[in-house]
Amino acid sequence: MSGGKYVDSEGHLYTVPIREQGNIYKPNNKAMADELSEKQVYDAHTKEIDLVNRDPKHLNDDVVKIDFEDVIAEPEGTHSFDGIWKASFTTFTVTKYWFYRLLSALFGIPMALVWGIYFAILSFLHIWAVVPCIKSFLIEIQCISRVYSIYVHTVCDPLFEAVGKIFSNVRINLQKEI
């Protein structure tokens, strides 16, 4: 063997047989071994979560960011007492904050369980039912498309070409009468 080529007993030059190159699990060639060692394994179960930025993809920017000023506003000329306004602001903000925490504590884990099961079922159905169904449909539709293509080329093309030639000499003259 020389330079990644294989010379047989009769002097013919071939590429190196696949067994001598190794396989994807135990490569013999250094380039493939380096390529595999550079890939980092990323496991979704062991990744760390960010406790500060809990919406890194900004899913709820336009929905959940509701402040006191977004809900309650007093126009000019109809203001309540300043103390009432401050107490209303504090009551609204604290109630929203703690009631959200209470609901999260009571229903957060059960809802996470429900949504985890739902998306697991959805992923399972997509992987094991939807994609194979679409692939089988595409394989089956190829036969129909070939028959349809033959039909179009043998029947429709000559028919429409003949009709086109018949009407190709039709001329329309428009004259405006005064």
Swiss-Prot record:
The modification Phosphotyrosine is found at residues 6, 14, 25. Residues 2-104, 126-178 are cytoplasmic. Residues 131-142, 167-178 are annotated as: Interacts with SPRY1, SPRY2, SPRY3 and SPRY4. It comes from Papio anubis (Olive baboon). Homooligomer. Interacts with GLIPR2. Interacts with NOSTRIN. Interacts with SNAP25 and STX1A. Interacts (via the N-terminus) with DPP4; the interaction is direct. Interacts with CTNNB1, CDH1 and JUP. Interacts with PACSIN2; this interaction induces membrane tubulation. Interacts with SLC7A9. Interacts with BMX and BTK. Interacts with TGFBR1. Interacts with CAVIN3 (via leucine-zipper domain) in a cholesterol-sensitive manner. Interacts with CAVIN1. Interacts with EHD2 in a cholesterol-dependent manner. May act as a scaffolding protein within caveolar membranes. Forms a stable heterooligomeric complex with CAV2 that targets to lipid rafts and drives caveolae formation. Mediates the recruitment of CAVIN proteins (CAVIN1/2/3/4) to the caveolae. Interacts directly with G-protein alpha subunits and can functionally regulate their activity. Involved in the costimulatory signal essential for T-cell receptor (TCR)-mediated T-cell activation. Its binding to DPP4 induces T-cell proliferation and NF-kappa-B activation in a T-cell receptor/CD3-dependent manner. The modification N6-acetyllysine is found at residue 5. There is a cross-link at residues 5, 26, 30, 39, 47, 57 (Glycyl lysine isopeptide (Lys-Gly) (interchain with G-Cter in ubiquitin)). Its main location: Golgi. GO terms for molecular function: ATPase binding; identical protein binding; inward rectifier potassium channel inhibitor activity; nitric-oxide synthase binding; oxysterol binding; peptidase activator activity; protein heterodimerization activity; protein kinase binding. Residues 105-125 dip into the membrane without crossing it. GO terms for biological process: angiogenesis; angiotensin-activated signaling pathway; apoptotic signaling pathway; basement membrane organization; calcium ion transport; canonical Wnt signaling pathway; caveola assembly; caveolin-mediated endocytosis. Residues 2-94 are annotated as: Required for homooligomerization. Residues 82-94 are annotated as: Interaction with CAVIN3. Belongs to the caveolin family. This is Caveolin-1. The modification N-acetylserine is found at residue 2. Keywords: Acetylation, Cell membrane, Golgi apparatus, Isopeptide bond, Lipoprotein, Membrane, Palmitate, Phosphoprotein, Ubl conjugation.
